[in-house]
Amino acid sequence: MGDLGAGLLQAGLLLLLLAAVHVPLGDFLARTFAGTRHLRLERGIYRVLRVDADADTRWPTYALSVLGFSTVSILFLYAFLRLQGFLPLSLGRPGMEPTQAWNTAVSFVGNTNWQSYAGESTLGHLVQMAGLTVQNFLSAAVGLAVAVALVRGLVARGTGTIGNFWVDLTRGTLRVLLPLAFAGAVLLLLTGVVQNFTGATTYPTLAGGSQTILGGPIASQEAVKELGTNGGGFFNANSAHPFENPNAVSNLLEVFLILVIPFSLPRAFGTLVGDHRQGLAVLSVMGTIFGASLALTTWAETHAGGSVPQAAGAAMEGKETRFGEWASALFATATTATSTGAVNSAHDSYTAAGGGVVLLNLVMGEVTPGGVGSGLYGMLVLAVITVFVAGLMVGRTPEYLGKRIGQREITCAALYVLVTPAVLLTGTAVALSDAATRSALLNTGSHGLTEMLYAFASAANNNGSAFAGLSANTPFYNTALGLAIWLGRFLPMVLVLALAGAFAAQRTAAETAGTLPTRSPTFAGMHLAVVVVVSALTFFPALALGPIAEALTGAQS
């Protein structure tokens, strides 16, 4: 089978798998968060935390719970990283220095997993398991909870309440993420992903030398790393390392784990609001942009200009030969269209066009399909903006699912779409304005700008992948990127919860002849246009100076 046939087979199998599970998983997610019964284990957790599981809260209480829990998580993980040298299973590794510990703690609690360190040489097994892997579960559950709270706000009929964060967090972790991650870890083990507790072992090589190989609890971390759209690797090479991703089967499974919850959440949304066509409209926008991104990235990497790529048949620099350009492009699209950030190839080595597309995925806000929870609430915020714009165009009162889009609602939505660009572009400008911080770039010109832009786009959008041409382990970048992660994660969450509270305080208006149908193909098309215009064109000047300029320069040469 040729490369084209193998690539199409992978994409087709992925599509079939996602189509097969998105309905049952989406319905399961809806039942999980709509139910009123608590499991015995859950009731025990609520008693320990002294939480009234039956209390319904307003959005300020919900937001304070999110921020309080995340702050405690950051402090706990920071202490864990600083004190590693005194902990068991540390493999003799010392604690992290303060700015790197801050960056790592915020990164994993913020579902970003930006790594300015090499995991195999910096962290021991206990920190990997009880520190980073635990946050892989909890950060994903926080995003899931916020998305569900927004949907509750749309469904509520004047109650002003959006649920209980502690109940949503517990259910998302115990009922959704833990079972799915366990199943994913078992399947990854069957494909050859490593799971043990060995340290560094030295083996003789066929060439007569020696090589030191590190084992560890990799499969258990790998499953939730992908399922929770986290992305932080056990090894510095991430999913390009054969212990994390040994073959084509494991690669396809990891891409499936990345996409399965984000693409199932629109179905859960449709079930919760009582109209599956609403979920299909959101899903169609996600799927259309994802498919276009995959096609463009694959084309760019398989039709690269220049004598060397043409002689090799594709741009294979920075890619594993066991995957090739098709599987690498599929993984790169999935990991940047969500908030995952895991990599099985070097994005910095992609063609200018291919690197530009994966960067575009980041700056579009990762809503196609986006991260666990964050993708859905990002799409719903953009749907609110779409309704508002459509209402202005045709002279109708803007309403979404029977909820009026007034000044308060559109203010929350507008601030939501402004936060990430402000953080991203400000951070990039500050880093480029000083010669000392510019010296961390390994490239100059348009590619150097792309590397810097990618770093802050990855941080502000909670992705975590990188163009490796930036030497980011410095006090400035550890601090600045950590701040970008915090602002890019939690400010949008607070605005989403404020929007949910505004909707929850309203009674649902009856649908009339003047109501804009938000489940029609026409609205879905306009929704798609708003995603592209609002999210992508905001960054066009920066993209024009970076990957677009590099691509045009390469075409001329």
Curated annotation (Swiss-Prot):
GO terms for MF: P-type potassium transmembrane transporter activity; potassium ion binding
Topology versus the membrane: Multi-pass membrane protein
Key words, A-Z: Cell membrane, Ion transport, Membrane, Potassium, Potassium transport, Transmembrane, Transmembrane helix, Transport
Phylogenetic classification of the source organism: Bacteria, Bacillati, Actinomycetota, Actinomycetes, Kineosporiales
Subunit: The system is composed of three essential subunits: KdpA, KdpB and KdpC.
Protein name, per record: Potassium-transporting ATPase potassium-binding subunit
Signal sequence bounds: none
Key word Nucleus present: no
Main location: membrane
Database matches in HAMAP family: KdpA
Gene assigned in the entry: kdpA
